[in-house]
Amino acid sequence: MSYAKTQTQSKSGYQAGVKDYKLTYYTPDYIPKDTDLLAAFRMSPQPGVPPEEAGAAVAAESSTGTWTTVWTDLLTDLDRYKGRCYDIESVPGEDNQYICYVAYPLDLFEEGSVTNMLTSIVGNVFGFKALRSLRLEDLRIPVAYLKTFQGPPHGITVERDKLNKYGRPLLGCTIKPKLGLSAKNYGRAVYECLRGGLDFTKDDENINSQPFMRWRDRFLFAQEAIEKAQAETGEIKGHYLNVTAPTCEEMLERADFAKEIGTPIIMHDYLTGGFTANTTLAKWCRRNGVLLHIHRAMHAVIDRQKAHGIHFRVLAKCLRMSGGDHLHSGTVVGKLEGEKGITMGFVDLMREDHVEQDRERGIYFTQDWASMPGVMPVASGGIHVWHMPALVEIFGDDSCLQFGGGTLGHPWGNAPGATANRVALEACIQARNEGRNLFREGGDVIREAAKWSPDLAVACELWKEIKFEFEAMDTL
């Protein structure tokens, strides 16, 4: 980079002026420590900016550096606290695009704070003029730092015990239309879906407390629906009551009321609500024995562009640290963005104890979760009964499959729509347990089940031509 090299020597040895970032922050001989937090950035420097200088600038501007030397550097140990760009590699097939690896000392981050961690790593550097684009692809969170976080309130194993549901994915449905229903009609829709065979129903992400349906009324009618459906079916049911609110105080007031009326699970929009609010709510949920469903509303604004932003695998890791028992993760086969290998990479990062580096799935670092509970992935968005075999094969048992339009769009109503999905799921689980390959034989499995389930047969006929086949934006 071209700078005006104006420097002034003081008696103390301090040199004022501007110097290249790479002189301080590019350290290719550095060997990362087990306690370092590691980051992989996809970067495109401006013309004329060497990749070493750009990588060093990323390390500097996301840790201790600024655009000029400052005399207060002499008051601290810069080598102890600075971020270090320790490796840079070209991205195959891309012109002027590089993966830049940065190691951050653990002391740079407040314990147990995703908010502080992200403020440091991505808070300022993404607007740096020397970079045309920058994307945070992955983080390696050291075990020493993970141990300062509570993580999910309960996790997958505890949730299954609470619900007494084993050996299959959970089934859910988002109530539609997402806006405009009265609280009583909303509760009616919840009841019909749950009695039809679903485990959960869900508030949509933008249902909070609007004039047409205030939160307290919705909570009461939804809980009445849960209790009636449980009494009829003998199964434990739930509805994700969205407690996202304008302030943390109001959020906790809604959570307290949900617990008081007996709901087993509540919901939060973690990106629009913020990580501070989410961590607060996750800790409340563990103290109070309530499950926490997390919606990722706004994620595509941050993660969909390949060259700039933050990859969802990072947002998923941050959620596991901040706390949540469920997290929406795409479907691979539905209407929302999601290439299979990349999607399953971050799904494993959500629910497994240890995940090895696997660049083919976009996993840049080996991640040990140090016994932190896992997060159940939620597949939701444009799925219907014909997708069931693929969803069971792709996501396995430890997942929640949510059919919104694929339940409520059934010609005979909500309860038959729920029954169609439950029959399709049970048929796929039985076929899988018998050793059948659902990728090859899934269509036959659904057709066989439809012969003795009129509800499923009608759903199969309605959605037999519906596909969402578009090229994925998120590729390696």
UniProtKB/Swiss-Prot annotation:
Gene3D superfamilies: Ribulose bisphosphate carboxylase, large subunit, C-terminal domain (3.20.20.110), RuBisCO large subunit, N-terminal domain (3.30.70.150). Mg(2+) binds at K202, D204, E205. It is found in: Carboxysome. The record marks K335 as: Transition state stabilizer. Binds 1 Mg(2+) ion per subunit. The disulfide bond which can form in the large chain dimeric partners within the hexadecamer appears to be associated with oxidative stress and protein turnover. GO terms for molecular function: magnesium ion binding; monooxygenase activity; ribulose-bisphosphate carboxylase activity. Its EC number is 4.1.1.39. Its cofactor is Mg(2+). Heterohexadecamer of 8 large chains and 8 small chains; disulfide-linked. The disulfide link is formed within the large subunit homodimers. Belongs to the RuBisCO large chain family. Type I subfamily. This is Ribulose bisphosphate carboxylase large chain. It comes from Trichodesmium erythraeum (strain IMS101). The gene is cbbL.
